[in-house]
Amino acid sequence: METQRNYPSLWRWGTLILGMLLICSVVGNLWVTVYYGVPVWKEAKTTLFCASDAKAYDTERHNVWATHACVPTDPNPQEMVLENVTETFNMWVNDMVEQMHTDIISLWDQSLKPCVKLTPLCVTLDCSSVNATNVTKSNNSTDINIGEIQEQRNCSFNVTTAIRDKNQKVHALFYRADIVQIDEGERNKSDNHYRLINCNTSVIKQACPKVSFEPIPIHYCAPAGFAILKCNGKKFNGTGPCTNVSTVQCTHGIRPVVSTQLLLNGSLAEVEEVIIRSKNITDNTKNIIVQLNEPVQINCTRTGNNTRKSIRIGPGQAFYATGDIIGDIRRAYCNISGKQWNETLHKVITKLGSYFDNKTIILQPPAGGDIEIITHSFNCGGEFFYCNTTKLFNSTWTNSSYTNDTYNSNSTEDITGNITLQCKIKQIVNMWQRVGQAMYAPPIRGNITCISNITGLILTFDRNNTNNVTFRPGGGDMRDNWRSELYKYKVVKIEPLGVAPTEARRRVVEREKRAVGMGAFFLGFLGAAGSTMGAASITLTVQARQLLSGIVQQQSNLLRAIQAQQHMLQLTVWGIKQLQARVLAVERYLKDQQLLGIWGCSGKLICTTNVPWNSSWSNKSLDEIWDNMTWMEWDKQINNYTDEIYRLLEVSQNQQEKNEQDLLALDKWANLWNWFSITNWLWYIRIFIMIVGGIIGLRIVFAVLSIVNRVRQGYSPLSLQTLIPNQRGPDRPREIEEEGGEQDRDRSIRLVNGFLPLVWEDLRNLCLFSYRRLRDLLSIVARTVELLGRRGWEALKLLGNLLLYWGQELKNSAISLLNTTAIAVAEGTDRIIELVQRAWRAILHIPRRIRQGFERALL
């Protein structure tokens, strides 16, 4: 009875605890949520395309930079400052530099591809000195060395005419540096026989007469899906973290000036001092790039009104050479303000001294090498100048001379007047992009003057001893020229897809989940062609991904084919890059949209899912994630688990689509109007026939059972119309008027006539039979549950009593063990103390025993 009274409270408390557990389990779960458009990026290498205002600078279509093929620049460029962002830059490992270097080489090669090869000019040249006509000298001609009248030679040679079997003798003017004397032996050596300098080392190609080398600013732009990060730190040295970061779509206009030693027409530092940039300032094998904060103007001139003439060197080929020199035959030269140069040099030396412990700094010209390295080489008005910079780099700066605000140095140059640099002009120019190839630059008519700004220097250094550091001008690797402008840029790939935990869960069609074998995800796109429709539907995600991969691979193959046939299609490098950029943008967009579609998130910026968040990915709370972390920090934390999360999203969406497909199969029951459709009438007739057949079958079964039952009782009805009373036991008398007794609740069983009464009677009997059996079954189940509950409760009580009993026994045993241990320890301690005391007394009694021994001995 006590147990039965405890049942209601037990069930009440059990239900309450179960509800609390369910609520806690629902509240505590986190689910993966997909976000599209998160501000996350990663370093990447991609194809950049160009933007330029070529028409604003030069209408000549044959400009070597082919900027007419670039897209127009944005009149309102957008630059977004990234607050609280620190990004690492490295100008020495920058794919933008390598890409620009490759582009400029391709442009030079393409511009010179259709030009004439000067192989027919590799003949013997009969040369003599040149006499100028109408020579006039200005008053300041003393600034320039006039004793250089042998700079050019008038050479005659035989060439093939339009008719191949006929030769013609022509003459042309060559610079002395472009020809070498032929050594035919000591006996037959002639001072008048020469050849072109590059005939035995490389193929010479003439620059087309319409090609212009005037640099035009080129803006490098990132395609859609990518961005260019820009460091706006004014003292940024090119490597390390930058805290002032912005994002742009295009760089500033970069003039691809090909020069050595001095950087021309570049960007300036925005601080009061020069900026020193080097991969390792202590490594003398690494170049040092100096960015000036103020420009130094350099004015270069080639005097003389030269003429140009065309010489036929074969069928369909023409060679352009200098005809006559009218005016001063002097070399070309450049002028630089001495005061301005020395002020700039003082800033450079002061900055270098801070890196080299204020040692004595020596500036010297290059020790040796090719003429392009030992001189300042550049292009001026179509002519290639090679200027001697010894006057610029020939001084010694002690610690006291550059740490003070003075410009004192051990130099013989006048720092107040102009510094004049002697220059040579070469028609045969070694190509800077590769070894073993040269170019013949046709002469330019008339006077040539170009004014440029020196915005940087390229230096090398060597340590003479512990007190001196020698710096020399360097260059030759044009990557340093591009690096001096691209130091503050880097290309990143925008990752708009992000996943994070939230408490929101997608409401889905629940269904028992089946395990999907991992092998299904590795089937090929066509590998499921022979599978069943059900098996192939599992690989739809893989097929969609591989379909896009096939498109991407096809586009890549097309681009490679176009690049291979670039010379046939007459496409510039910019055309190839624009095609690549546009295809790449489409591929990036399709890839993101493909993933969103696979996850069931098409067209959504925030998409909840049914994938539970695993704490092993990140065990941070929602407040720590959403209130204290940026998307970049969060992406770095879960980057190792992104692939796993993506896979689970695909599996979840596949299961959801399968459940929806199964639900649609039952969806026709949701619309009652469809029940009255004519197409369903045959189904209704079939169902009716099945019901009637079932009733008839049940009637037959019950009739057979009734007959069998009566036969077993030994009674047979006389007629189908006879009312058959139920049999009563001898202990149950019928009720009569005079006596009491049990009420007669029994009825006679009447056999009915007709189909409908028969159906009704059978249905009634069937329902009563089912009801009674179900009632009996429920009664049995209730009694069983009650019994199990009582037995379970008694077992729990017994288990509780056992736990209490054994807990008390363990407690008593522990107390007894502790007491025994304490007693044993106490007894042992007492014995140890007693032994120590005895030993101590024995030690104390040693002198007494010795004294007693002596006393006995004396007695």
Swiss-Prot record:
Q: Which residues cross the membrane?
A: 688-708
Per the UniProt entry, what are the Gene Ontology biological process annotations, in alphabetical order? clathrin-dependent endocytosis of virus by host cell; fusion of virus membrane with host endosome membrane; fusion of virus membrane with host plasma membrane; positive regulation of plasma membrane raft polarization; positive regulation of receptor clustering; viral protein processing; virion attachment to host cell
Cytoplasmic topology ranges: 709-859
> Which Gene3D superfamilies does the record associate with it?
1.10.287.210, Human immunodeficiency virus 1, Gp160, envelope glycoprotein, Single helix bin
Query: Which stretches does the entry tag as region MPER?
Result: 665-686
Annotated motif YXXL motif, positions: 715-718
Q: Could you tell me which residues belong to the region Disordered?
A: 724-743
V4, as annotated region: 387-423
Q: Where is this region: V2?
A: 155-199
What are the start and end residues of every segment in region (V5)?
Answer: 466-474
Q: Name one GO cellular component term.
A: viral envelope
Q: Which SUPFAM superfamilies match?
A: gp120 core, Virus ectodomain
Q: Where is this region: Immunosuppression?
A: 577-595
PTM per Swiss-Prot/TrEMBL: Highly glycosylated by host. The high number of glycan on the protein is reffered to as 'glycan shield' because it contributes to hide protein sequence from adaptive immune system.
Disulfide pattern: 50-70, 115-208, 122-199, 127-155, 221-250, 231-242, 300-334, 380-450, 387-423, 601-607
- Give the residue interval(s) assigned to the motif Di-leucine internalization motif: 858-859
The superkingdom of the source organism is Viruses
Give me the ranges of the annotated region V1.
Answer: 127-154
Q: Name one GO molecular function term.
A: structural molecule activity
Residue positions of covalent lipid attachment, annotated as S-palmitoyl cysteine: 767
Family per UniProt? Belongs to the HIV-1 env protein family.
Q: What remark about domains does the record contain?
A: Some of the most genetically diverse regions of the viral genome are present in Env. They are called variable regions 1 through 5 (V1 through V5). Coreceptor usage of gp120 is determined mainly by the primary structure of the third variable region (V3) in the outer domain of gp120. The sequence of V3 determines which coreceptor, CCR5 and/or CXCR4 (corresponding to R5/macrophage, X4/T cell and R5X4/T cell and macrophage tropism), is used to trigger the fusion potential of the Env complex, and hence which cells the virus can infect. Binding to CCR5 involves a region adjacent in addition to V3.
Protein name, entry field? Envelope glycoprotein gp160
Q: Which organism is it from?
A: Human immunodeficiency virus type 1 group M subtype H (isolate VI991)
- Designated gene of the protein: env
